[in-house]
């Protein structure tokens, strides 16, 4: 049976986990042949929940921020996190403690190696393990400006291959997505843009 997530499988600023259960209640009022269009898709959580609750419905997820690409790289991200975890544990750095000196330098050297040889780093996930309070950075130079902490999780992220199963994924400006489906019968727009208080630095 397909697993239903009530929070996004990878870190994301402004994910909708706080009202996931209330959202499920609201979905019950819509028929099974509804076309749901998630205009500001973010982590895809609302699209995922909608498809789990309404498996026969059409669900369109506007992945403007490239979350699907992050999901596809989970195995690579887990491998990098495992290396970082081993480095921190070998040095005996306690949880939530600051990472300084030679270990900090070695961590950045490992990140630079990954970027050079692997060609991809999920900076949001990696920085969530090395920084505090959702202080996500999107490049190594930006990370170097910040203090590092041992906030690395002890286990791998689940690969969640079925998270977006059965969902139509697009990546467009929300106005374009709205115009594309506005004349379709039984369409319902899921409209939840980033809050004014949300740090939009990680959004496209």
Language model region names:
Residues 1-35, 45, 125, 129:
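S-adenosyl-L-methionine
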Residues 16-24, 154, 171, 175:
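Short, well-ordered alpha-helical scaffold segments within catalytic/effector domains
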Residues 20, 43-47, 177-179:
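Short, well-ordered alpha-helical microsegments
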Residues 31-34, 56, 184-186:
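A general structural motif
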Residues 37-50, 61-65, 129-131, 183-199:
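Conserved proline-anchored active-site loop of SAM-dependent methyltransferases
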Residues 52-58:
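Conserved S-adenosyl-L-methionine
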Residues 58-164:
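Class I S-adenosyl-L-methionine-dependent methyltransferase module
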Residues 164-204:
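Conserved mid-sequence domains
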């Amino acid at each position: 049976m397909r697993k239903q997530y009530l929070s996004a499988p990878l870190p994301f600023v402004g994910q909708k986990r706080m009202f996931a259960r209330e959202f499920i209640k609201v979905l019950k009022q819509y028929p099974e042949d509804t076309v749901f269009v998630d205009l500001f898709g973010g982590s895809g959580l609302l699209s995922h929940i909608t498809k789990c609750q309404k498996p026969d419905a059409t669900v369109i997820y506007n992945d403007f921020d490239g979350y699907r690409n992050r999901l596809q790289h989970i195995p690579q991200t887990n491998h990098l996190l495992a290396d970082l975890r081993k480095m921190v544990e070998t040095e005996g750095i306690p949880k939530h403690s600051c990472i300084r000196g030679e270990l900090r330098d070695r961590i950045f050297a490992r990140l630079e190696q990954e970027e050079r040889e692997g060609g991809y780093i999920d900076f949001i996930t990696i920085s969530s393990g090395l920084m505090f309070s959702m202080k996500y950075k999107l490049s190594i130079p930006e990370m170097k400006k910040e203090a590092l902490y041992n906030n690395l999780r002890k286990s791998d992220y689940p690969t969640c291959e079925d998270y977006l199963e059965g969902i139509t994924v697009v990546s467009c400006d929300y106005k374009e997505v709205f115009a594309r489906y506005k004349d379709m019968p039984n369409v319902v727009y899921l409209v939840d843009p980033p809050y004014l208080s949300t740090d939009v630095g990680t959004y496209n």
